[in-house]
Design a protein with these regions (language model features):
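Active-site catalytic motif of lipid deacylating hydrolases and related acyltransferases
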Residues: 19-79, 129
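Gly/Ala-rich beta-loop-alpha elbow adjacent to hydrolase catalytic centers
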Residues: 84-85, 89, 93
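Conserved alpha/beta-hydrolase catalytic His-Asp/Glu region
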Residues: 140-185
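Glycine-rich His-Gly loop
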Residues: 29-31, 86-87, 110, 196
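N-terminal export signals
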Residues: 1-16
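Conserved serine/cysteine hydrolase catalytic core
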Residues: 66, 172-214, 218-232, 237
Length: 246
């Protein structure tokens, strides 16, 4: 059964957030165990609100390649843009977010490292989330097992739908996990963070730590790691807020 919808603001908007420029463009980046279609429910709501939404097909090979794919999408935007990342792609948002077109950053249950920070070492300061034990490797390519995907990644998604999502997950290359950001866009740009309180992929307390450290305007959503699918109205609303359309 899907979790009840809860979106609780836990931090007041920072001065930076209040000064964010209005935008009509949104670039969305997916993380591990997913593909660009994971944003479909959010995109439909953004388009209905008059936003121009672009979902990046993240290659999941190296951090540099993922940032380059996102940069290509940013290059196509015609003005101020909100850059949104889920899960691993918070790394990409942190790096690519320095682009001058990007006026605000949104992290959805996402990694948010500082420049040159070892994210793995940071994550080890918190209890390990169950999903990591479910990664299955074929040579240097990893993906979640079906059991781990249904239980630890998409726990509040109806099983039939979660199985479809499992089938379209893109494998990721081992080298991707060793990449480090060289910039931290959140240090200079307004940031928002959606914590997933029922997350079994990234520890919710780690999410809270990263959100607080960056001074992000933060909400807590009672959702699995896939709040963008189980609670798309909340995530779309957060994006519209960051874009100045709330």
């Amino acid at each position: 059964m899907a979790a009840a919808t809860v979106a609780t603001p836990i931090l007041q908007p920072t001065a930076q957030a209040q000064l964010a420029r209005k935008a009509r463009n949104v670039v969305l980046v997916h993380g591990l165990f997913a593909d660009g279609s994971s944003w479909s429910e959010v995109i439909a709501r953004l388009q209905a609100a008059g936003m121009n939404a672009t979902s990046v097909q993240n290659p999941l090979t190296t951090l540099d390649a993922s940032v380059a794919a996102t940069q290509r999408a940013l290059d196509l935007q015609d003005g101020p843009t909100v850059l949104v990342g889920h899960s691993f792609s918070g790394m990409i948002v942190t790096q690519a977010g320095i682009d001058p077109k990007v006026v605000s950053l949104i992290y959805v249950a996402a990694r948010a490292p500082d420049a040159n920070e070892d994210y793995t070492a940071l994550a080890k300061r918190f209890p390990t989330s169950p999903a990591s034990a479910g990664i299955v490797w074929t040579a240097d390519w990893g993906q979640l097992s079906e059991a781990a995907f249904l239980r630890d990644f998409a726990g509040d998604i109806p099983v039939a739908k979660a199985r479809v999502l499992y089938s379209v997950q893109s494998p990721f290359q081992r080298e991707l996990l060793s990449g480090k950001t060289t910039h931290a866009a959140w240090r200079t740009k307004p940031s928002w963070y959606a914590v997933s309180t029922e997350d079994r992929t990234i520890n919710p307390d780690l999410e809270r730590f990263m959100a607080k450290r960056m001074g992000a305007t933060t909400i807590e959503v009672k959702a699995s790691h896939l709040s963008l699918i189980s609670q798309p109205a909340i995530i779309a609303g957060l994006i519209l807020n960051a874009a100045g359309h709330a």
